[in-house]
Amino acid sequence: MYYKVAVSGSGKVLNVFSSEELLIGERVWLNWRNGKVKGYVLERSLSHENEATPSERDGKSFLSEGHVEIAKWVSERFFSPLGMVFDLFFPQGIDDYKEEVVVSESPFLDFDRMTLRDFLENFGEKALKEMVKKGLVRVEKNFYVKEPRPRVKKRLFLKKRISEIIREHLTVKQRMVVEYLQFNDGVPLEELLEDLEVSKSVIETLQRKNIVEIVSGDVFPKKRRILRGDFKGNISKENLFFGPTGSGKTEALFELIDVYSRKGTVLFLVPEVSVLTHTLSRLKGAFPDLKIGIYHSYLSRARKNLEWYKAASGKIDVLLGTRSAVFVPVKNLSLLIVDEEHDESFYQHTRPSYDAIVVARKISEVFDVPIILSSATPDLWTYREAKEGRIRTFNFTRRFGSLSVEVVDMRNEEKIGSFAKKTLDRIEETLEEGKRVLIYVRRKGFWGRVQCEVCGYVLKCENCDVSLVYHSDTHSLKCHQCGREYGLVESCPRCGGRLVGRTAGTERVERELKRYFPTRRIARVDREVVDNIMELESYIDKLIRGEIDILVGTRLITKSLSVPEIGLVCIMDVDSLIFNPDYSSSLRTFQLVVQALGRASRGDQGKAIIQTYNPEDTIIRKALEEDVNGFYAEELERRKALGYPPYRHLIQVAVKSKNPEVGKNSLTSLKEFLKGEEVLGPVEHWVFKLRGFYRHHLIVKTEDLERVLPKLEKALRILGIDAIVRVDPPTLEVSD
């Protein structure tokens, strides 16, 4: 029998002959070109050409024909190599957790299955080959997981009230345990250690502090939490949960999980690990009896494979994960949920590129399961389809808290450093009320750029066409694209004029605040001080516990941060977001401002302040009014007139080269090949030089991807151009 097999890590498809019947979606290892490659069985082939020979196979497939259909579709829709797309369905290292078994296919054999090792010891390799050839046995891989043996469970409980624990001096990991137990008091000890990836020594220390206690056995019956039952809607195939922060969207999602987890496995996608950690705690608190798996990039290889296997084998009720979890072949899928579906993190820019939202909707279609997209500021594609009735909309309104927003016109205000005096007054008032303050700054570093005040020259990285950022703690200039650091220079290298800092970054804002409020506890969160999600969680924990009064940060701090103690949110330098040279900058700014303001609406009387030199800008005005519908109507009208998504698709084709003329000429040739299509460019990318390479790109606008993408693929192949292709990226400014 002949089969078409997609080669792992590439776009190559081989025609393969196998004496054994192969399963659709099964992994096979092929002898090809003097080596061995992994492949995925696509379908039976009518061609009798034999390009490679199978040497090994799984013997079973975790992927159904539906998954194969999805892989083909994703490859075509996002111009991603088919073999690379198939690789996304499996975690790295999955083959470290397998054993080969021989399975009987004949009633006359005296065994049902035995390990390959035992079979070879008893019968030998020659017998195995003969029996496989005759169809008497088959060899398959049994993927195993090392799960603990059943035993009496030890459960962990808090012994002290939270008000008492707050006064204790705890490490970051100890605080993580306490916060987890706030939602999940009485959780099995092994489950907590697995979820938080902490050692038993952390628990032992908390025991010595008399904060927790361990009790053996099931000391209370497990049960589902009785939910409010406020959500009465009957969902359709595709649904949008649309409403501001605090409107009850999450509670409604939990009620649906309560229903659909009884029917199968719920796949719950979130944009970031920080959001996942908080959602996991809430889920376990609401459903202590549910088996909840997690899947994200910070898991150890062993843990990730374990979680994947459980989901693929139908051993969990809910799989909670970030972008990559959309490809886990969940067995008996009953419901798809995408929270914060507007977030750009759902798009993978590196090859193979894809949009997890679009993939999730395709999964919903292929496997005929409902999907919920939830957001206060939906993606424009989603919003347009909802308005046109193709997606059912459930509107939610805020049930608690109110928000007072003040716009500070920086043209007319008295300024003290990076702040208006009015802003500093509001910060002081908030602190006097015992509330916390959150300050959003777009850039990290001390100064966003260093510029000559005489000729205007901006210091840039030699490898990248990017302005250097001054960091006061190291007294150095740093490129935040390639990471190269430079020593300080005293004068302008062009004219000898005086160099000055422009556009305050997080370091500068933090230092100013420490000068204005010397007795207050002020911290900074950006990628320079936070390396992983656990560190970010520790800052949030300190904010909740009152160990931080003012938290300064970049976009990190706007990601679903739920802290009722926040009394004021300040947004600095909003203008730099609005005037970013990207077709999506207005929408991205609006979404960020609304999401940031949502952090202040968790409390009883939240306040926010926005510093701007353009107070009449539509984006700011609509965001203040939380007029999502009004802003989206205007944005849709603008994009329709300009031919941008969601009315037309955008295909970005980018190249990089050591010689700038080479890249530009290659894209010029490509444009000629695409004659008849609407093509913008080629032009220099606004980050023209990056890591020593010069970058050019062009944009293709089309309403018909199925027609244009094959044409583009043919052109790139004939011209021999190695390009990065992104279909409908949320932004065009991402570096390669």
From Swiss-Prot:
Any Pfam family matching the protein: PriA_C
Residue numbers binding Zn(2+) 1:
C452, C455, C492, C495
**Could you say which residues form the signal peptide?**
none
Single GO cellular component term: primosome complex
Protein origin, superkingdom: Bacteria
Q: Name the chemical reaction catalysed here.
A: Couples ATP hydrolysis with the unwinding of duplex DNA by translocating in the 3'-5' direction; ATP + H2O = ADP + phosphate + H(+)
Q: What is its EC number?
A: 5.6.2.4
> Where, by residue number, does Zn(2+) 2 bind?
C461, C464, C479, C482
Gene Ontology molecular function: any one: ATP hydrolysis activity
UniProt keyword annotations, A-Z: ATP-binding, DNA replication, DNA-binding, Helicase, Hydrolase, Isomerase, Metal-binding, Nucleotide-binding, Primosome, Zinc
Residue span(s) of domain Helicase ATP-binding: 230-396
UniProt cross-references to InterPro entries, sorted A to Z: DEAD/DEAH_box_helicase_dom, Helicase_ATP-bd, Helicase_C-like, P-loop_NTPase, PriA, PriA_3primeBD, PriA_3primeBD_sf, PriA_C
Q: Which residues form a coiled coil?
A: none
User: According to its UniProt entry, what is the function of this protein?
Assistant: Initiates the restart of stalled replication forks, which reloads the replicative helicase on sites other than the origin of replication. Recognizes and binds to abandoned replication forks and remodels them to uncover a helicase loading site. Promotes assembly of the primosome at these replication forks.
Assembly behavior: Component of the replication restart primosome.
Query: What is the protein name given in its UniProt record?
Result: Replication restart protein PriA
**What organism is this sequence from?**
Thermotoga maritima (strain ATCC 43589 / DSM 3109 / JCM 10099 / NBRC 100826 / MSB8)
